[in-house]
Amino acid sequence: MTARNLFLLPGDGIGPEAMGEVRKIIAYMNEAMDAGFVTDEGLVGGCAYDAHGAAISEADMQKALAADAVLFGAVGGPKWDSVPYEVRPEAGLLRLRKDLQLFANLRPAICYPALASASSLKPELVEGLDILIIRELTGGVYFGEPKEIIDLGNGQKRGIDTQVYDTYEIERIAGVAFEMARTRQNRVCSMEKRNVMKSGVLWNQVVTETHKAKYSDVQLEHMLADAGGMQLVRQPKQFDVIVTDNLFGDMLSDVAAMLTGSLGMLPSASLGAPDGKTGKRKALYEPVHGSAPDIAGKGIANPIAMIASFAMCLRYSFNMVKEADDLEKAIANVLDKGIRTGDIMADGCRQVGTVEMGEAILAEFKALSA
């Protein structure tokens, strides 16, 4: 069997605790399923800065580049608030995204039936919610040049950011969206601001042309991004796959995340382009939540987002679709049984810590995969 190489970067805060529960699942899969996972581990974020003076070392960067997939925990915390900007903990994640050329960020917003009452919206609006937001990750206003603050004199300054998209960047992210839609409900909604932004005009044109040329079997809708934000909280279940640029994707995916009730529940994936020879994509998987330094080391963090990120890894990097389905079903089954970490605790449920939640999910996964 060909080895499946995983590089683990637990990071800071609750990252190591959540990653610990994924390690148990990997060990079980190797033992019971002969899955062939080979794991290595490195430092990223604040802990890497403490050890190496950088948010990720060159050696660990090379290991990430060589791996089939990277599992990432979380970075940051008040301890590193005063470090130089270029070596801040978050710079490690940005370096990974850049060097791995990860242009497509996949953010599922799934509301488990057992948690519908935890959403800020009415349960009937979110129960059964299953949206996939696909955000372009390497272009747009976050990376466009010029990006600077100019001193105009007389006490006045000017901040400049530049929104830039080329045709190929839009084509490839649209292609990912249409391909993902084919495995779901076959619907894509593209969001931009073509009414006020030239980049939005081009985005709309290129998505439309890509759809017509290669993906006419998929239903395509266009929506202005501000209207899309409104519709996400008005009638979220109307959406299947949403594709949008870096800035709007950053905002809309966080809006969608809170429809589900807890950031501690949500995974994400960042994918690169398929390799010309093997067809494999570089990929990084991470929970949406941050490092939560206030609860780090207390054993109470919710590991579900990290475990669900590993399920995405099984699906998209290793084509282990049944195993991914089983792991996601295991999470749902545990929630149906009323087992909760503190962040999603509700009346009548049983509160557990990180390890007990992880072990409950593993037990369900074992039963489903037996």
Swiss-Prot record:
Lineage: Bacteria, Pseudomonadati, Pseudomonadota, Alphaproteobacteria, Hyphomicrobiales
Site feature: Important for catalysis: 142, 193
Keyword annotations from UniProtKB, A to Z: Amino-acid biosynthesis, Branched-chain amino acid biosynthesis, Cytoplasm, Leucine biosynthesis, Magnesium, Manganese, Metal-binding, NAD, Oxidoreductase
Positions in coiled-coil regions: none
Designated name of the protein: 3-isopropylmalate dehydrogenase
Pathway: Amino-acid biosynthesis; L-leucine biosynthesis; L-leucine from 3-methyl-2-oxobutanoate: step 3/4
Residues given in the record as substrate binding sites: 97, 107, 135, 226
Keyword Cytoplasm among UniProt keywords: yes
Organism: Rhizobium etli (strain ATCC 51251 / DSM 11541 / JCM 21823 / NBRC 15573 / CFN 42)
HAMAP family xref list: LeuB_type1 (MF_01033)
Subunit structure: Homodimer.
Catalytic reaction equation(s): (2R,3S)-3-isopropylmalate + NAD(+) = 4-methyl-2-oxopentanoate + CO2 + NADH
GO cellular component: cytosol
SUPFAM superfamilies, sorted: Isocitrate/Isopropylmalate dehydrogenase-like (SSF53659)
Enzyme class: oxidoreductase
